[in-house]
């Protein structure tokens, strides 16, 4: 459904990533794990995961947009948002979209995997689980090129300390000055679990990462395709 929004704030997070708060002219009903599209033109709709959870957004929608210099696709959206914030103009979105929302009727443990700004997808799901006091085991693996990309690392470490059923594992590719897990986030998951058969797996990142996860987890770790969720799976 097309909805006009005001841009309430734009906050730089780290590594060319911005937290953007939108205030829609009417409430948007969505599920944790869904996404919206920013309408840049009649045939130009650009998808971004909703980072806020349905039960906490208080009418606002939070986005985390990574707009590195080489990424004009996202950078143009951020510039459009900045212009709307300065002028008080509207941003047109279309929402909600996606079938990779949290399956709340499942009793299985949850594995949340994010690559880079794919974190916004799993953040919505994690925040929803906390606010709804869902107590089943939740494992969150977040991979980035370096520690700078993991802009919510301190927040997630605090959450994991406060909730014994939540485990947070950051993984970076560049190990200089880093004492945690290094390398590929999918390899880190495979090293930590003998089997993924009894897990609901939610994943967000580049299409090639999602495809590799589906292939490797089902063939090597007994994961079930029907228990793998991610927007990429609708396209690959």
Curated annotation (Swiss-Prot):
First-tier enzyme category under EC: oxidoreductase
PROSITE patterns assigned: FAD_FR (PS51384)
CDD domains (UniProt xref): flavin_oxioreductase
InterPro entries reported in the protein's UniProt record: Cbr1-like_FAD-bd_dom, FAD-bd_FR_type, FNR_nucleotide-bd, MRET, OxRdtase_FAD/NAD-bd, Riboflavin_synthase-like_b-brl
Binding site for pyridine: 115-119
Ranges of residues in domain FAD-binding FR-type: 1-103
Record's keyword terms, sorted: FAD, Flavoprotein, Luminescence, Oxidoreductase
GO molecular function: oxidoreductase activity
This enzyme's EC code(s): 1.5.1.-
Pfam families the record matches: FAD_binding_6 (PF00970), NAD_binding_1 (PF00175)
UniProt similarity note: Belongs to the Fre/LuxG FAD/NAD(P) flavoprotein oxidoreductase family.
General function of this protein: Involved in bioluminescence. It is a good supplier of reduced flavin mononucleotide (FMNH2) to the bioluminescence reaction. Preferably uses riboflavin as an electron acceptor when NADPH is used as an electron donor.
Stored PANTHER family: NAD(P)H-FLAVIN REDUCTASE, NADH OXIDOREDUCTASE HCR
Protein name: NAD(P)H-flavin reductase
Organism: Aliivibrio fischeri
Name of the gene: fre
């Amino acid at each position: 459904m097309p909805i006009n929004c005001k841009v309430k704030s734009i906050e730089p997070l780290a590594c060319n990533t911005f937290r953007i708060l939108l205030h829609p002219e009417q409430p948007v009903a969505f599920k944790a794990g869904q996404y919206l599209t920013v309408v840049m033109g009649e045939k130009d709709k650009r998808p971004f995961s909703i980072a806020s959870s349905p039960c906490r957004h208080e009418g606002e929608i939070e986005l985390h947009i990574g707009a590195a210099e080489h990424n004009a696709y996202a950078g143009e959206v951020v510039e459009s948002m900045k212009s709307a914030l300065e002028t008080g103009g509207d941003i047109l979105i279309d929402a909600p979209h996606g079938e990779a929302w949290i399956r709340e009727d499942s009793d299985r443990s949850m594995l949340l995997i994010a690559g880079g700004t794919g974190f916004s997808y799993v953040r919505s799901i994690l925040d929803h689980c906390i606010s709804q006091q869902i107590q089943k085991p939740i494992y969150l693996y977040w991979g980035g090129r370096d520690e700078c990309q993991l802009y919510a690392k301190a927040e997630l470490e605090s959450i994991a300390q406060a909730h014994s059923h939540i485990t947070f594992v950051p993984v970076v590719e560049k190990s200089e000055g880093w004492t945690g897990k290094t390398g590929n986030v999918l390899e880190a998951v495979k090293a930590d679990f003998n089997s993924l058969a009894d897990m609901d797996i939610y994943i967000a990142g580049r299409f090639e990462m999602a495809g590799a996860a589906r292939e490797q987890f089902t063939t090597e770790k007994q994961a079930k395709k029907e228990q793998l969720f991610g927007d990429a799976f609708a396209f690959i």
